[in-house]
Amino acid sequence: MRLDTMKETPSSPVNTEMQDNFGCAVGNRFHQLLDDESDPLDFLYQSGVELTRRKKKEDAAAKKSANQKSGKKESQKDRKAAVVGGNTDVKMTPQTESGKVSQKDRKTFVVGGNTDVKVTQPGQKHAPKNMEKAPQNENVGSQVKVDRAERRPAFREVRPNIMDRSNEYSIEKPMEILDQDKQMRNYGGRGGMRGRGRGGFPRNTENDNLRGKREFDRHSGSDRAIRPEDKRGGSGPRNWGSIKEAFSEIEAIPVEEQIETTETTEATEEEHAKVPEEKNEGFSQEMSLDEWRSLQDQNRSKTEFNLRKPEAAVPTKAVVIHKSKFKNNLSENEEDYHYCFRKPVNDITAQLDINFGSLTRPSRGRGGGGRGRVRREEAFPHEVINVLADAPNPDDPEDFPALA
């Protein structure tokens, strides 16, 4: 839009120049929304319709691609040919566009009835021979189960191929062991009281052992190598004797003796428990702390040390150090203690008298010539200062109070 600040006067040329020179252009940012009367909900509805159209197009394209693929490879449902009912002759020639036949295409699933199935593969010229016809019977599966059950040998059945087992080692179980076996067998097999599977409910509660298998005799080697008669005399292989003799040697301990022993042990324990209580009651006394400590010292076990007594004889390697000799050595070495640094053998500094105060200092004067009053240096006497003190005497209690 273009707005003019001046009023229009058609006859004046000045106004036209003013319009061209002093006009300003103003743009309205919201002029596009002035003519918009549509509802925003309509826009949302249209966008939803467009989305549905796109989805339909995508689904149609996916179906077309699937049909194209199915022309090359058949689906799994098409590969299965299920034939149900009476006598039928089925001939299958699985061939695809590519000319290859998959292994799944060669399978035929036939359910019930007599069927003659002929499968011709592309590599074979003639079809294979007809398969043998199965007998007509509706309960085919049940008949097979019955045959398998009949083939199973009975539990603990003596088989003709195996020699008769000798009962020489069999021992009758006592009643207590049989009761325990029955209680343990009630828990079932590995799975417990499940009702099915390996566990399940117990089959027989009698004449069975804990392991659930046949009871093996106690011997080593195979059944063929066992001799029926017992060996005696202590010679030859497998001379173990009979197990009955081993059990007869073990004598059962009577129950009365066990009861008597338990009663005696209980009585002795009660007596031992009463005796310390009586002693403690009579020993209660009042005493001071010092008396109690003295009693503790008396009751305490004293440790005995194996001390060596001094001998009168002097050992041969003993050396006596005289005190006078030690003092003389100290007096001789007193001069050496004044020097704390090591000195070489050819050192002459101890013989020279060096005075550092005799050195001349630079004069103070005007100009660079060093003119001025000459200052007279005074000679200072050289004083010898003893830095190190005398070494302490170990025999003097004042120097070593802890060693006195």
Curated annotation (Swiss-Prot):
Primary location class: nucleus
GO biological process annotations for this chain's record? positive regulation of RNA splicing; positive regulation of translational initiation; ribosome hibernation
Query: What is the scientific name of the source organism?
Result: Xenopus laevis (African clawed frog)
Its domain of life reads: Eukaryota
- Composition-biased stretches (Gly residues): 188-200
* Name by which UniProt lists this protein: Intracellular hyaluronan-binding protein 4.L
Name the GO cellular-component terms.
Cajal body; cytoplasm; cytoplasmic stress granule; nuclear speck; nucleolus; nucleus
The entry assigns this protein to a family as follows: Belongs to the SERBP1-HABP4 family.
Gene3D superfamilies (UniProt xref) = 6.10.140.1040
Indicate yes or no for the key word RNA-binding: no
* Keyword Methyltransferase attributed: no
Upper lineage ranks?
Answer: Eukaryota, Metazoa, Chordata, Craniata, Vertebrata
Q: How does it assemble?
A: Associates with ribosomes; promoting ribosome stabilization. Interacts with eef2/eEF2; promoting ribosome stabilization.
Q: Which gene encodes it?
A: habp4.L
Pfam families reported for this sequence: HABP4_PAI-RBP1 (PF04774), IHABP4_N (PF16174)
| Protein function | Ribosome-binding protein that promotes ribosome hibernation, a process during which ribosomes are stabilized in an inactive state and preserved from proteasomal degradation. Acts via its association with eef2/eEF2 factor at the A-site of the ribosome, promoting ribosome stabilization in an inactive state compatible with storage. Plays a key role in ribosome hibernation in the mature egg by promoting ribosome stabilization. Ribosomes, which are produced in large quantities during oogenesis, are stored and translationally repressed in the egg and early embryo.
Transmembrane intervals: none
Instruction: Give the Polar residues compositional bias ranges.
Output: 8-19
Location of region: Disordered: 1-21, 51-288, 359-379
